Amino acid sequence: MSRLLLFISLFFVSLPMFSQELRPDTVPSRPVKKSYVHLLHTDITRFDEAIDPEAWILVGNVSFRRDSMYMFCDSAHYYQKRNSFLAFGNVRMEQGDTLFLYGDYLDFDGVTNVARVRNNVRLIDKDIVLETDSLDYDRNRNLGYFFEYGVLYDSTGVLRSYYGDYNVDTRTAVFLDDVTLENSKFLLLSDTLYYNTDSKVATIVGPTNMYTGSTEVYSDRGTFNTATRHATLVERPVLYNDNRNVTADSIFYDTAKGYSEVFGNIVYTDTINRNMLTGEYAFLDEVRDSVYVTGRAMAVDFSQRDSLFVHSDTIWALTYNLDTDSLYRKVKSYNKVRAWGRNMQAVCDSLVFDSRDTCMTMYKDPILWNGDLQLLGEEVKVYMNDSTINWVNIINQALYVEELDSSIYNQIKGKEMEFYFTDGELREMHVIGSVEVVFYPLDSDSTYIGMNTTTSGRIIAYMKDRKVERVVVPKDSKGVFYPMSQRPEEKRFLDSFAWFDYVRPLSKWDIFNWRGKGGDKELKVIKKETVPLPTLDRFKK
């Protein structure tokens, strides 16, 4: 009798079921739950204790519903008591018209509301696709997490890693372990990355390298927008471009337009030319190969044993004729320029270095010091040779002062001066135009024998150990020699004499402390004739 009842029950439950939920009176009962897994359809339903004593075996066009989630497959094992099922073949889950989850196998736990999808898994949420071989989808949190390598595609790039998750509600992906984010314009490598598929913003939370064009970026914290290709980086990021790199407290980098704004404790280094720029704000233009620095701006040349430090309000490093054979660079320092090196110090209002003639030109009240020597004029040009001084040209109101002791100075003035150096040491000086000299010669025991005053149209002075060794003057020069005890007070100093030791930078840190000259010590204003520019009217006549 019991066998007959079993046969009859199996006969009826084996009939096809179409578009109806399995009623409670046709399946084993289960405790009432807040939310059920409902069987919507199956072609064949059977019970086979040998296969699974706790499950209904469903075959053909199987579909389930749990709340707003619909699930489809070729066949399934349905555990009504556990409110769960196993799905096999062409597994598909749908929620609304935007979320789809595909795979070859699904283990759905109705108690925890977690769907475990395996093999050829694809999660589609609007315009994004996540592919992996193993994904667990938590419907309580609308969170899918994978652990056997995953790839996320959206309209701006491809994101890969070994582990990660995707939140459907926030549309945010968290990728871990060997992360890559890339498209044809950039490549980002990290160990941890947060990515919002709506805003297209990747959040960097660990050591990360990014490559775009010829630039490499390193950062531990920041964001990168894959749509705009804007990066905002903090905690001392570094940008590398060929032989140059820059680091700072924070960097905004527009990789699309090729420029960056750099903020706080900036260090910009040229490793080939061995120089550096520092400051509090910088603008870097990769397209024009130019740099602008301000806020305690400083340029440092460390190409030689003794480094040279230059400070001004603003420093520009500009490149001209880029990508041509006539490429050259200019470095411009504006306002309150102060420079310090062990063998040379300088101040002026502005300074320009031109790589075409390796000339550094100082404008407006420039002063140079070399040991006990002080040089000044209206304009000073310093010509370099392999980062050492080759020769110096002082133009207009040129003045040379050499301190011998606290009250004795060798002094030379003229319209123009030329200084020639050998191995960085001053060897020869030419003074041209309205030359006046106050010179103290020495005897054999280095005692001053008197004071020599000379006027001439031109002189040549030869130097040794940064001091005047001898002076050559033309025969038509005029001069008077005074013994030391008979020096006239009014002849001891030239009328343009000035000793600016209080202005001189004392160290590389002192260049940030501006000290101007006294108002009575400014150079005389010389009126210069200007040639009128031709006009079109002149050519018409």
Model-based region annotation:
Residues 1-26, 541:
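Bacterial Sec-dependent N-terminal signal peptides
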Residues 20-541:
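N-terminal amphipathic/hydrophobic interface segments
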